[in-house]
Structure formats: structure tokens, C-alpha cells
Amino acid sequence: MASKVEKTHALPPCCSTESLISSIGLGIFCLVADRLLRFPIIQHNDWLRAISDNIVHGVIGMWSWAVVTGIRKKSDFGEVLLAGFLASVIDVDHFFQARSLSLQAALTLPRRPFLHCSTVIPIAVLSVKLAVHLFKLRDSWRFLPWMILVSWTSHHIRDGIRHGLWICPFGKTPPLPSSFYVISTLSLPHLCSFLMYLTGTRQTVSSKYGMRIDV
């Protein structure tokens, strides 16, 4: 009779009860957090609004990656924090575009900064994946392109409810419906997890640590 681990390997890991519950929680967080950010006390203070908005991006990035991988060991916490950092750090391009550390200048740009072009995401993902292969980095680094995909895509989708998606060189879409934002955000980790499962990335990373990541 097949062992429990072998049976689990045969199932898509993104379909476990725990990951489905976690992603529903993520969707609820998206709805609640964005409603809280509409409070006048936040909207009337540029610094508070910018920091709060960036924190929400970070939390969504962390939560999304936690759904992808599950948290089974201490190193997973480091990955989750890195995912949150990647989801938040995109906004630093506002200051680069403004060529100033002034928040007012960063918030009043004539056009969107370069990291907010959604075409950058597949370019960055493929570039990092190629670098991991060319430089023969450890198997434990094979998750990084997927983490960038999840973290940056979640950021772009959330920004899309206000500004639409900027897809160079084709222009931008209309603002995304809130329902699309929530459904896409809670579905994204499952899509990523399933693709990692199909490509063998999950098995490679988990075998490196002598265990299977169960999501």
C-alpha cells in the first residue's frame, strides 16, 4: 500500500483544505484593509496613507506566499518576510522617478514609474530564472522567480483597481473591478502553487530540506 506521503504527492498541493481556508482569509483581508484605508484620518494624511497602503501590499505578499508554500519550518518565515518585502519595495520607484525623497513629489508624478509596468514582471521572472540556472545557484533559490511573480503581480493587481494595469507598450486597461481584484488575489497563490507542482519546483525545493512542502 502506498505511503501517506506518496498519496499526497499524487494530489495537487494547492487543493488542500488549509490552503483554501487561508486564501479565503486573504480575500477577506483585502476587502477589510482597503475599506479601512478609506477612513478620512488616513486619506487626509499623505504619510499615513502611503505607509498604510504599502503595509497592505506587504501583508498581501506575505500572506500569498504563505499560501503557496505553507509554513512548516523556520526558514519558511524568512521566505514569507522576503515576499512581503518584494511586494512593498516596488513603490520605491516613485522616488526614483521623482528624483527626490519628497513624498509629495513621489505622489504627484506625471506618469507611472517603471516598476509599475506589468510587462516588467515576466521579464524579471525569466531573468531571475535564467540567472539561477546560469550561475548554478542552490536548489533552495529556485523559488525566487515564483516569489517575484506572486509578490509583484499581487501589487499590480491591487494598484489596478485605481489605475488599471499598465502593459507596455500597449497602454493601460481601465480600472479593475474590486471583485476581479479580490478573486485574482486569492487565486494567484493557488495558480503559482499548481505551476510549481507541475514544473517540479516544489519537489526540488522540498527534497533539498528532506521534507515535502504541503500546501
UniProtKB/Swiss-Prot annotation:
The chain crosses the membrane at residues 77-97, 114-134, 178-198. It is a multi-pass membrane protein. It is found in: Membrane. Keywords: Membrane, Transmembrane, Transmembrane helix. One of its GO terms (cellular component) is membrane. InterPro entries: TMEM267. Its main location: membrane. This is Transmembrane protein 267.
